[in-house]
Swiss-Prot record:
Cofactor annotation: heme
Keywords of the record: Endoplasmic reticulum, Heme, Iron, Membrane, Metal-binding, Microsome, Monooxygenase, Oxidoreductase
Cell compartments where the protein resides: Endoplasmic reticulum membrane; Microsome membrane
Known function: Catalyzes the N-demethylation of benzphetamine to formaldehyde.
EC number: 1.14.14.1
Membrane topology: Peripheral membrane protein
Name the record gives this protein: Cytochrome P450 2J1
Pfam families, per database record: p450
Length: 501
């Protein structure tokens, strides 16, 4: 590198022709790029890459998780991609995924924070934080969620109450076609609101609807091409208009909403009475007054609250897939109806206690999650120290994605991997848990809201199946086409909720 710089300087001093200088500069840039991005010895294989751009424009961002499966066939269960100089390794197959997420988890425990996320959140919050900050915030969030009823009857009763509001909202549609997206989102988000803010919102509340609309937009925008380009070229993209600027604006509005809720809590905060997550966080902050080193501050409170809402959107996507699959597979929906009718009837409120007695319904919910595949490549990890995985060398800082798409469609794990088949989770008529089913991830960084999400999914889904038959509109053909965002969700569609006699 020093020799190349010396040669360029000598050329400049010799007064060479401008074209010669330009060619020399280009050659130097290519040489510098090669040195910077050349793959280390014994690095995982991968497809051919373009200079500077890598594999960026060979991937279809809308279907990248499907395109990657072709690379698995060609390069094996461990391969790499280059996105404009950023190396990413894709890990496929249950044994290797368990190595990364469980057995060698300390080597892969961190999250890479992309520029698009760092611009709004820095490295704060629950989802993308790392190190001591992440440990403190996750430990506190888990403890607080448990204190507010996670796994207890009190939180289950909140979910049951919200399920009643959801069924009433759908009854008002009178069996006519409607988009269930925001009704489901209302219900799921109200559970998070009750935990974080200590209150729920009416479905027609204008402020609440604006909040949900902003969240829906950021879910989609963050995966858009312009936002991905911002992750690669932030120093250029920050000056250009586009979806990334809308994303930043939306996050700012969401931060202001949480800030207003925080200010309202401060006005009547009583440390002896903890009403919700914000109160609990304020109490924790009071233990470190004026501390510059504590991770418990207002900035982290706002980011953690937004992360809780963001995690809740996964349940919304699962529920939307669930109703869509029921409308497309009426014979399976009939079996769900029959089981619910025979076990709890049409009037008893579904509860988690009835889950064991409803194995087919439980299997259907799990199959919805498998086929819905809402986190196709899981949440990224980052290598914390130079590591050897399956004989390959992964340098510190390498970004790692675990291929849940391949795992949940693996023909060695599933009898009919590409077909919606609840029998995958049944054995002799009883529900059977599958090791290869990990929609919430596994290990220390598994989804902290897993238990809450499972309760919501079961109670909401069973309550709706108890009251309605879901059918396609007569003038609309339903499909399993998806919309790529932070999660994979169905494309916009309408559905009919026919009240059951």
């Amino acid at each position: 590198m020093v020799a190349a710089l010396s040669s360029l300087a000598a050329a400049l001093g010799a007064g060479l022709h401008p074209k010669t200088l330009l060619l020399g500069a280009v050659a130097f840039l290519f040489f510098a790029y090669f040195l910077k991005t050349r793959r280390p010895k014994n690095y995982p294989p991968g497809p051919w890459r373009l200079p500077f751009l890598g594999n960026l424009f060979t991937l279809d961002m809308e279907k990248s998780h499907l395109q990657l499966q072709q690379f698995v066939k060609k390069y094996g269960n461990l391969f790499c991609l280059d996105l404009a100089g950023k190396s990413i390794v894709i890990v496929t197959g249950l044994p290797l995924i368990k190595e990364v997420l469980v057995h060698m988890d300390q080597n892969f425990i961190n999250r890479p924070v992309p520029p698009i996320r760092e611009r709004s959140f820095k490295k704060n919050g629950l989802i993308m934080s790392s190190g001591q900050l992440w440990k403190e915030q996750r430990r506190f969030a888990l403890m607080t969620l448990r204190n507010f009823g996670l796994g207890k009857k009190s939180l289950e009763e909140r979910i049951q109450e919200e399920a009643r509001h959801l069924t009433e909202a759908m009854e008002k549609e009178g069996g006519q076609p409607f988009d269930a997206h925001f009704k489901i989102n209302n219900a799921v988000s109200n559970i998070i609101c009750s935990i974080t803010f200590g209150e729920r919102f009416e479905y027609h509340d204008g402020q609440f609807q604006e909040l949900l609309k902003l969240f829906d937009e950021v879910m989609y925008l963050e995966a858009s091409m312009l936002c991905q380009l911002y992750n690669i070229f932030p120093w250029i993209m920050k000056f250009l208009p586009g979806a990334h600027q809308t994303l930043f604006s939306n996050w700012k509005k969401l931060e202001l909403f949480v800030s207003r809720m925080l200010e309202n809590h401060k006005k009547d905060w009583n440390p002896a009475e903890t009403r919700d997550f914000i109160d609990a966080y304020l109490k924790e902050m009071s233990k470190y007054p004026g501390s510059a080193t504590s991770s418990f501050n207002e900035e982290n409170l706002i980011c953690s609250t937004l992360d809780l809402f963001l995690a809740g959107t996964e349940t919304t996507s699962d529920m939307r897939w669930g109703l869509l699959f029921m409308a497309l597979y009426p014979e399976i929906q009939e079996k769900v109806h029959a089981e619910i009718d025979s076990v709890i009837g049409q009037w008893q409120q579904p509860s988690m206690a009835s889950r064991e007695s409803l194995p087919y319904t439980n299997a259907v919910i799990h199959e919805v999650q498998r086929m819905g595949n809402i986190l196709p490549l899981n949440v990224p990890r980052e290598v914390t120290v130079d590591t050897t995985l399956a004989g390959y060398h992964l340098p510190k800082g390498t970004v790692v994605l675990t291929n849940l798409t391949a795992l949940h469609k693996d023909p060695e794990e599933w009898a009919t991997p590409d077909t919606f088949n609840p029998e995958h989770f049944l054995e002799n008529g009883q529900f059977k848990k599958k090791e290869a089913f990990i929609p919430f991830s596994i290990g220390k960084r598994a989804c902290l809201g897993e238990q809450l999400a499972k309760s919501e999914l079961f109670i909401f889904f069973t309550s709706l199946m108890q009251k309605f038959t879901f059918k396609p509109p007569s003038d609309e053909k339903l499909t399993l086409n998806f919309r790529m965002g932070i999660t994979l969700s169905p494309v916009k569609h309408r559905i009919c909720a026919i009240p059951r006699a």
